[in-house]
């Protein structure tokens, strides 16, 4: 499964918003954001 995200920096956090799915997460670093994206996708699609 491929889930696409729009990723942006909002002056304090890296944010990711699902393009076709209602998923949103954030992280202080890109590495933390990637971990949070994986977790959010696993929770959204059990």
Where are these regions (language model features)?
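A short N-terminal helical cap/helix-turn-helix that marks the beginning
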Residues: 1, 35-46
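Conserved acidic segment of CheY-like receiver
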Residues: 3-7
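Short aromatic-glycine-(Arg/Gly/Cys) micro-motifs in beta-strand/loop hairpins
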Residues: 8-17
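Short linear interaction segments
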Residues: 10, 31-32, 43
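A short, exposed loop/beta-hairpin motif centered on an aromatic-Gly-Thr core
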Residues: 21-31
């Amino acid at each position: 499964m491929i889930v696409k995200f729009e990723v942006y920096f909002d002056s304090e956090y890296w944010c990711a918003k699902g393009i076709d799915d209602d998923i949103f997460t954030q992280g202080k670093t890109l590495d933390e954001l990637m971990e949070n994206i994986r977790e959010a996708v696993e929770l959204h699609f059990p």
